[in-house]
C-alpha cells in the first residue's frame, strides 16, 4: 500500500515530533511516499537543495499523490500546502484521514472539517497518545473494504 503523509513544512515545523510518530506507525501499513515530511532536519524553508525547486517539489508530490492508495494528514498546524494536497486528493477520490489535536488551542478550517463525508474523507480529533490506536483502527477498516 502506498501512503501519502501530509504535514506542515513551510507553514511551521512545531509538530515534527508528532509527524515522526505518525510516519513510524504508518510504515507498519505500507510505504510512506512522503516520509521526508517527518525529518527533523527539514526546516521551514523546505527542501532547499532540490534542483528546479518549487516546480520539482510540486510535480513530484503530485505524482506521489496520484500513486497513493490513502492520504493521512496531520492538520493541526495550518498549511497552505497541506490544504492544496487535500483538495487535490479529494478531487482524485482518494481515501483521506485528517488528524487534528484540539488541545493545540487552534481551530480546524471549516473547509477541512466540512469536507467529511463518512467514508472517503474523514477527520479525527485526537490526543497525541491516541495516534497509534486511531491509525490501527483506520487501517483495519480499510482492509475490510
Swiss-Prot record:
One of its GO terms (biological process) is nucleotide metabolic process. Coiled coil: none annotated. GO terms for molecular function: 5-hydroxymethyl-dUMP N-hydrolase activity. SUPFAM superfamilies: N-(deoxy)ribosyltransferase-like. Keywords: Cytoplasm, Glycosidase, Hydrolase, Nucleotide metabolism, Nucleus, Phosphoprotein. It catalyses: 5-hydroxymethyl-dUMP + H2O = 5-hydroxymethyluracil + 2-deoxy-D-ribose 5-phosphate. This is 5-hydroxymethyl-dUMP N-hydrolase. The gene is dnph1.
Amino acid at each position: 500500500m502506498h501512503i501519502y503523509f501530509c504535514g506542515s513544512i513551510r507553514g511551521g515545523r512545531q509538530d515534527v515530533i508528532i509527524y515522526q510518530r505518525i510516519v513510524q506507525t504508518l510504515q507498519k501499513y505500507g510505504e510512506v511516499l512522503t516520509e521526508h515530511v517527518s525529518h527533523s532536519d527539514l526546516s521551514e524553508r523546505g527542501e532547499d537543495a532540490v534542483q528546479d525547486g518549487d516546480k520539482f517539489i510540486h510535480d513530484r508530490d503530485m505524482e506521489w499523490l496520484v500513486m497513493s492508495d490513502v492520504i493521512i494528514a496531520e492538520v493541526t498546524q495550518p498549511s497552505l500546502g497541506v490544504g492544496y494536497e487535500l483538495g487535490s486528493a479529494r478531487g482524485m477520490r482518494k481515501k483521506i484521514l485528517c488528524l487534528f489535536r484540539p488541545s493545540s488551542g487552534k481551530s480546524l478550517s471549516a473547509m477541512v472539517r466540512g469536507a467529511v463525508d463518512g467514508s472517503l474523507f474523514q477527520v479525527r480529533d485526537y490526543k497525541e497518545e491516541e495516534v497509534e490506536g486511531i491509525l490501527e483502527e483506520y487501517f483495519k477498516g480499510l482492509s475490510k473494504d
